[in-house]
Design a protein with these regions (language model features):
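Conserved binding/recognition cores within well-folded domains
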Residues: 2-97
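C-terminal output/interaction extensions
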Residues: 111-119
Length: 119
């Protein structure tokens, strides 16, 4: 059976203020990289967001759960919320449907499309 069919494990995320968040992957819409501050931020389905600790890398995030997929050097989404892939951006399902900033870069697009069609 595929890893997506098993009950999702909760993941432990450490914020920049050293708080520990225990979150289920299905409560996470996407991660966004703040290039200026060089920090990742997680956006939850409550639309709260938290800044992750400095040592967090894209690789760290991608290893949290199989449903996280990188779409741009500054964005990692939860593919289970993916609704639409257009030319160079993607739209997520509610409550993230108002988020219009999710850019898809050429480098990650093929992998994203492959994953999307495999669902």
């Amino acid at each position: 059976s595929s890893p997506l069919s098993q009950p999702a494990q909760s993941i432990l995320i450490t914020t920049i203020t050293n708080d520990k968040l225990i979150v289920r992957p299905e409560n996470i819409g996407f991660f966004k990289y703040d290039s200026e501050r060089k920090l990742w931020r997680v956006v939850l389905n409550s639309l709260q967001h938290f800044i992750l600790k400095h040592q967090t890398t894209a690789e760290t995030i991608l290893n949290y759960a199989p449903e996280f997929i990188q779409i741009h050097k500054t964005y990692i989404i939860n593919i289970n919320y993916l609704y639409l892939i257009s030319e160079n951006s993607c739209t997520l399902l509610p409550p993230f449907n108002k988020v219009s900033e999710l850019k898809v870069s050429k480098m990650y697009k093929k992998k994203l499309l492959d994953r999307f069609y495999d669902m």
